């Protein structure tokens, strides 16, 4: 029978503002110990598929240093430290990154971004219906974001063709397909 590993010891290997790594000592089965199991520690993430009354998708384009490219994706962001409501985080991120807001939210659920080497980092997916532009963008210090509006059918085709490469963006579009096309 599969059993959870036993945590013996935990310490910070790296504890910086934007990146934290924990070094765990774990017993994976009786007598078998791993001394250096590293976990990247992240806050949960919210991803927002915002749909306008005209059935358009609100996308953002920004440089992603990890990929080394300018990426087109759905609005998203980390939950702030101490923030415990993913819906409130989703509303905040949508407004900050795009200036759009919505009063109609549907939760698609949460998914693990990396269940092997990351702790926390659950990805919460939301559908924001009838999204409207109500404010200016409010960027974080490290953001420069362009907002793009695409018909849902075009965004879905972009996901299928690989033009949209973020797995969370593709997943959200695929989950929304049946809801929005019926």
Q: Where are the language model's segments positioned?
A:
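A short, amphipathic edge element
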Residues: 1-11
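Conserved Nudix-box catalytic region and its N-terminal flanking loop in Nudix hydrolases
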Residues: 2, 47-92, 139-141
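Nudix hydrolase/Nudix homology domain
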Residues: 2, 70, 124, 141-182
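Acidic, metal-coordinating catalytic segment for phosphate/diphosphate chemistry
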Residues: 11-47, 52-53
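Conserved hydrophobic/aromatic beta-strand scaffold that supports enzyme active sites
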Residues: 21-23, 49, 125-127, 147-149
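Short loop segments at secondary-structure junctions
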Residues: 29-31, 52-54, 63, 83, ...
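Active-site segment of metal-dependent pyrophosphate-handling enzymes
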Residues: 43, 51-54, 64, 73, ...
């Amino acid at each position: 029978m599969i059993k959870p590993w036993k945590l013996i010891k935990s310490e910070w290997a790296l504890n910086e503002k934007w990146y934290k790594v924990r070094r765990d000592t774990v017993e994976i089965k009786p007598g078998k110990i791993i001394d250096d199991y590293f976990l990247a520690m992240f806050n949960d993430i919210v991803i927002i598929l915002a749909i306008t009354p005209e059935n358009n998708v609100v996308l953002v384009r920004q440089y992603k240093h990890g990929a080394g490219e300018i990426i087109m994706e759905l609005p998203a962001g980390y939950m702030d430290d101490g923030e415990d409501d993913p819906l409130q985080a989703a509303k905040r991120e949508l407004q900050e990154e795009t200036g759009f807001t919505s009063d109609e939210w549907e939760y698609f659920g949460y998914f693990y971004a990396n269940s092997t080497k990351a702790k926390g980092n659950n990805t919460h997916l939301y559908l924001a219906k009838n999204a409207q532009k109500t404010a200016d963008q409010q960027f974080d210090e490290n953001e420069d974001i362009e907002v793009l509006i695409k018909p849902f059918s075009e965004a879905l085709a972009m996901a299928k063709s690989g033009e949209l490469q973020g797995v969370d963006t593709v997943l959200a579009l695929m989950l929304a397909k049946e809801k929005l096309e019926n």
